[in-house]
From Swiss-Prot:
Protein's cellular compartments: Virion; Host nucleus
Main location: virion
Protein's recorded name: Major capsid protein L1
UniProt subunit comment: Self-assembles into homopentamers. The capsid has an icosahedral symmetry and consists of 72 capsomers, with each capsomer being a pentamer of L1. Interacts with the minor capsid protein L2; this interaction is necessary for viral genome encapsidation. Interacts with protein E2; this interaction enhances E2-dependent replication and transcription activation.
GO cellular component: host cell nucleus; T=7 icosahedral viral capsid
Length: 503
């Protein structure tokens, strides 16, 4: 008897349609009005390796300022809808809203080129494995040494309207079914977080959480042994559907290994016996195979600088072509080619020293940085059609709130309770009440705030970046003061008429 049964093959249904992300060029109209804005000189000074607290209390007296930190500038722009425009007829406030588009940027860096050293007075160094004349040294209780290094060389610039994202390796979670003991290697997890001002860059030792993954505080130099070194998540920011975190980026990295050491300590993962043959004369047991180089960024030169030159944004790599949503720009800068650490000293005596005595002199370290940010912004307008408003609300609902637009919910048909005194202790806690003030989504993050709300100007020719921009677009400046020199007039002699000859 034949028995019919359905096919065992899986039936694949078509995927659900995904809303298409459109480029800002499709709904943002650009005008021919450009503004210049600059921050002037920005300075910061501190200790290059660690922050110094005050003698009384936990407040910081001298901050940590290192060339190997990220500088994340949060540049605040004026609201163009409340801006004094040269022509009020440029847009219709009832059906359009104005936004800024960043078309040019220049990051100015002061101070000379230099190489700054970092290190650790108790660095975990067992043997010099590059020029070793023995198989291994005795792995004593403490063999740490005073080692200094020059870090990896990095120049970086990221521009976007949201904070950049960084990645690093952190300590993961051990599964409950996995047995673990003290001293086992911790599991690793790739973590993605925002890059904040003051976060450490990758110095050549890897992007990782050293405080959680290196308990000896001696495997890396002082300035990162209790910090987290982050590396920009270029893959994640490039895959951002809206392209807000990274319009474009500039990057230059350089590194080589200067010295080769191995680590002191008990080797957690033993070398398999099949990988070596035992010997004599102290070579019965191999030494530590936990090798680690010291990085070096090598020579710094002005010919390889990405700063102090203009960059023009014609087409961003994502869907956001330079539109500064929420009237702000995030500029992330790293420059380790100006990492000079200044050595300062002062005498402990009230009178000037007549002879050198090191016990009467205090030595200090300081690092200073100098920046100058310049921008060219283009005035743009968005036509608020129902389709565009729905798209913007899906992308970022706060934009419509900033433009005094909101969604009106349909009236509820059910009976709801509304208390009068919502803060009274006599009634139940009103947890679902909406906050009265708008919350800053980045309030808990640390950035270098730069306010440019009163620094916009139409006189592009009066500023260095503005003149470079006018040269790019082919504009010619006309002289305001007329020339007093009288033009010389020349008269050409009138040619003599030829007489007709009679035939």
């Amino acid at each position: 008897m034949a028995l019919w049964r359905s096919s065992d093959n899986l039936v694949y249904l078509p995927p659900t349609p995904v809303s298409k992300v459109i480029s800002t060029d499709d709904y943002v109209t650009r005008t021919n009005i450009y503004y210049y804005a600059g921050s002037s000189r920005l300075l910061t000074v501190g200790h290059p390796h660690y922050s110094i607290p005050k003698s009384s209390g936990n407040k910081v007296d001298v901050p940590k300022v290192s060339a190997f930190q990220y500088r994340v500038f949060r540049v605040r722009l004026p609201d163009p809808n409340k801006f004094g425009l040269p022509d009020a007829r440029i847009y219709n406030p009832e059906a359009e809203r104005l936004v800024w588009a960043c078309t040019g940027v220049e990051v100015g860096r002061g101070q000379p080129l230099g190489v700054g050293l970092s290190g650790h007075p108790l660095y975990n160094k067992l043997n010099d494995t590059e020029n070793s004349n023995i198989a291994h040294a005795e792995n004593g209780q403490d063999s740490r040494d005073n080692i200094a290094v020059d870090y990896k060389q990095t120049q970086l610039c990221i521009l976007g309207c949201t904070p950049p994202m960084g990645e690093h390796w952190g300590k993961g979670t051990v599964c409950a079914r996995t047995s673990s003991a003290a001293g086992d290697c911790p599991p690793l997890e790739l973590m993605t977080t925002h890059i904040e001002d003051g976060d450490m860059v990758d110095t050549g030792y890897g992007a990782m959480d050293f405080a959680a993954l290196q308990v000896n505080k001696s495997d890396v130099p002082l300035d990162i042994c209790q910090s987290t070194c982050k590396y920009p998540d270029y893959l994640g920011m490039a895959a951002d559907p809206y392209g807000d975190s990274m319009f474009f980026f500039l990057r230059r990295e350089q590194l080589f290994a200067r010295h080769f050491f191995n680590r002191a300590g008990v080797v957690g993962d033993k070398i398999p016996d099949s990988l070596y043959l035992k010997g004599n004369n102290g070579r019965e047991t191999p030494g530590s195979a936990i090798y680690s180089p010291t990085p070096s960024g090598s020579m710094v030169t002005s010919e390889a600088q990405i700063f102090n030159k203009p960059y023009w944004l014609q087409q961003a790599q994502g869907h956001n072509n330079g539109i500064c949503w929420a009237n702000q720009v995030f500029l992330t800068v790293v420059d380790t080619t100006r990492s000079t650490n200044m050595s300062l000293c002062a005498t402990t005596e009230s009178q000037p020293l007549t002879t050198y005595d090191a016990t009467k002199i205090k030595e200090y370290l300081r690092h200073g940085e100098e920046y100058d940010l310049q921008f060219i912004f283009q005035l743009c307008k968005v036509t608020l059609t129902p389709e565009i408003m729905a798209y913007l609300h899906t992308m970022n609902s706060a934009l419509l709130e900033d433009w005094n637009f909101g969604l009106t919910l349909p009236p509820s048909t059910s009976l709801e309770d509304t208390y009068r005194f919502v803060t009274s202790s006599a009634i139940t806690c009103q947890k679902d009440l909406a906050p009265t003030e708008k919350q800053d989504p980045y309030a808990k993050l640390n950035f270098w705030d730069v306010d440019l709300k009163d620094r916009f100007t139409l006189d592009l020719s009066q500023f260095p970046l503005g003149r470079k921009f006018l040269l790019q677009i082919g504009a010619r400046r006309r002289s305001v003061v007329p020339s007093r020199k009288r033009r010389t007039t020349t008269t050409a002699p009138t040619p003599a008429k030829r007489k007709r000859s009679k035939k």
